[in-house]
Amino acid sequence: NQRGAITVTDGNLMMCAANDVNIFAAITLTRGTADPTRSLGLPLGLTLSADTDGTGPGVEGGTVVFAPLAPLATVTAAPVSIYYNPVSYAAPTNYGTEFTLTEGAALKQYMLVFADGGDKEFDGTTATTLTGLKGAPPGVVLVAGPNASANYTSSEAGTDKQITFTGYTLGGANADAYALPFNCCGPVVASTTGTINPAAPPPTTPPPTTPPPPTPPPTPPPPTTPP
């Protein structure tokens, strides 16, 4: 949550959160920098990135929210990138009304999409394979590269468990309107969620049944000799 005014000159600003990024106060950024001695390793310009833990889709997973009374963010001669969850993929949020952009500053906003297909049965390992995207966003597909890798953060059974992955990208006619949710600290990985179902119990083998001993036929009495 950003509640105090922020001013950046000849530098970059990145605000990210596992859930919502909330803007309550003024942001003023003038000229980003690609100079590695001053960029802090941040993307060029202003970046607002929600739902970095990959719990979407949907705003419940996290989105970028400008408070109704927040002043317009002012960006001069630098790019602005917003990564957010929309209410619906059919209704992207228009963040352009929240900014004053001058001297070539440009806004790019990306709807977050989430890899699917990672559910599996418990097998004691974390590895899984991702296929498709949750919520069927139009015009975009998940593409697995030759070194694609996906792993749960733990091997125990459970629902809504975090999966981190690398080597997957987006393709399709509208791919440039979307982005995968990446973390903002540490080694770069994307995230989604999945379920590890408990292993099915092994089938039980009934104990062998011993047949009862056969009953011998009745023995007739010996014939009697009349006196």
Located regions from the model:
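The right-handed parallel beta-helix/beta-solenoid scaffold, focusing on the short coil/turn
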Residues: 4, 11-13, 19-21, 25-27, ...
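Short solvent-exposed loop/turn micro-motifs enriched in small/polar/acidic residues
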Residues: 7-8, 187
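Detector for methionine-enriched segments
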Residues: 14-15, 111
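Short loop/turn motifs that initiate or flank beta-strands
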Residues: 38-43, 50-227
